From Swiss-Prot:
Keyword Metal-binding assigned: yes
Protein name stated in the entry: Ethanolaminephosphotransferase 1
The species this protein was found in: Pongo abelii (Sumatran orangutan)
Biological processes, Gene Ontology terms: phosphatidylethanolamine biosynthetic process
Family: Belongs to the CDP-alcohol phosphatidyltransferase class-I family.
InterPro entries xrefs: CDP-OH_P_trans, CDP-OH_PTrfase_TM_dom, CDP_ALCOHOL_P_TRANSF_CS, CHOPT
Length: 397
């Protein structure tokens, strides 16, 4: 498996023809964030590889997730009567979240600034963005947590799916239309949650207990914003863009079945994971919510990454992600009835396997594309120039 190649020769040929095509109509992004990023990118040295900026931002997101997992492992820290997360943690998480968001915004500008834009950079950026969504949602959950003043773990599970499907819709659009319509929700949510983290440090989590309007709690606002953004902005815009492409005869696929293929694996993942929750003899989501969310988010990220590879290379998306096979078997075993500790072991084993499989997929795809385009993923130096330097050294030049 160490040398397994996930990207086919047909896909590599498709990457050679790929040209970045994206549309960003978000006013916040256009009139506030892009001018800010244009200023920030000038701080970075021109020898700094864009992918290194992207990866650094992703690591900050992971750090926030782990930091909050330490102080709030089971999402009870914000509930009344429990030890709350220290104020300094909220400040750190808020600052790092905004820094990560900024790095995600300047990586493409650094690529254009250094004339180092490649399909690998686009795939690397969107692939890590895709995995980041589960980290974002789960970390934000700690603001409200569970309990009488919070949101139930099952409601958060459903909200996670709303966010995940909102992300994949934009890449499903590009798979069918050839144009990536950047979602409005991402920029708005990143700025908002960074601000809310800092506010939480100032006013304390107790401030979120109180109703802010007509007994409407902040937790309800949190839920309404996620669902409202998905149903009133993301989904309508995606369908509108798809319909426009259909009317203009610019759809890449003429079959409804083929157009929907990229959504099969995510939908099946939702069905299987939800079935596990509903059939669980030990109420697995209540026992290990953080691990369950991460398992779902990682499996989803793997399916979405495969879609991104296919839409960038103009190849057919696989109908089924093989990670769903062991998940199906686990759900089948759980339905037959197992002891609580056995179910927990199955969850942790499956989560570990999914994580290792996804990391292996990412590393191998990056290595394949780096070799294909003759570049280093984290350096602007060219492999050919290194070889030339060694040859000159050997002949005494």
């Amino acid at each position: 498996m160490a040398g397994y190649e996930y990207v086919s020769p047909e896909q590599l040929a498709g990457f050679d023809k790929h040209k970045y095509s994206a549309v960003d109509t978000n006013p916040l992004s256009l009139y506030v964030m892009h001018p800010f990023w244009n200023t920030i990118v000038k701080v970075f040295p021109t020898w700094l590889a864009p992918n290194l900026i992207t990866f650094s931002g992703f690591l900050l997101v992971v750090f926030n997730f782990l930091l909050m997992a330490y102080f709030d492992p089971d999402f009870y820290a914000s509930a009344p009567g429990h030890k709350h997360v220290p104020d300094w943690v909220w400040i750190v998480v808020g600052i790092l979240n905004f820094v990560a968001y900024t790095l995600d915004g300047v990586d493409g500008k650094q690529a254009r600034r250094t004339n180092s834009s490649t399909p690998l950079g686009e795939l690397f950026d969107h692939g890590l963005d895709n995995w980041s969504y589960v980290y974002f949602v789960v970390t934000v959950y700690s603001i409200f947590g569970r309990g009488s003043t919070g949101v139930s773990v099952f409601v958060l599970y459903l909200l996670l799916w709303v966010v995940l499907f909102s992300f994949i819709l934009s890449h499903w659009e590009k798979y069918n239309t050839g144009i990536l319509f950047l979602p409005w929700g991402y920029d708005i949510s990143q700025v908002t949650i960074s601000f809310v983290y800092i506010v939480t440090a100032v006013v304390g989590v107790e401030a979120w207990y109180e109703p802010f309007l007509f007994n409407f709690l902040y937790r309800d606002l949190f839920t309404a914003m996620i669902i409202g953004c998905a149903l009133c902005v993301t989904l309508p815009m995606s369908l509108l863009n798809f319909f426009r492409s259909y009317k203009n005869n610019t759809l890449k696929l003429n079959s409804v079945y083929e157009a929907m293929v990229p959504l099969f694996s995510p939908c099946l993942l939702f069905i299987l994971s939800t079935a596990w929750i509903l059939w669980s003899p030990s109420d697995i989501l209540e026992l290990h919510p953080r691990v369950f969310y991460f398992m779902v988010g990682t499996a989803f990220a793997n399916s979405t990454c495969q879609l991104i590879v296919c839409q960038m290379s103009s190849t057919r998306c696989p109908t089924l992600n093989w990670l769903l096979v062991p998940l199906f078997l686990v759900v089948l075993v759980v339905n037959l009835g197992v002891a609580s500790y056995v179910e927990s072991i199955l969850l942790y084993t499956l989560t570990t396997a999914f994580t290792l499989a996804h990391i292996h997929y990412g590393v191998r795809v990056v290595k394949q594309l780096s070799s294909h385009f003759q570049i280093y993923p984290f350096s602007l130096r060219k492999p050919n120039s290194d070889u030339l330097g060694m040859e000159e050294k050997n002949i005494g030049l």
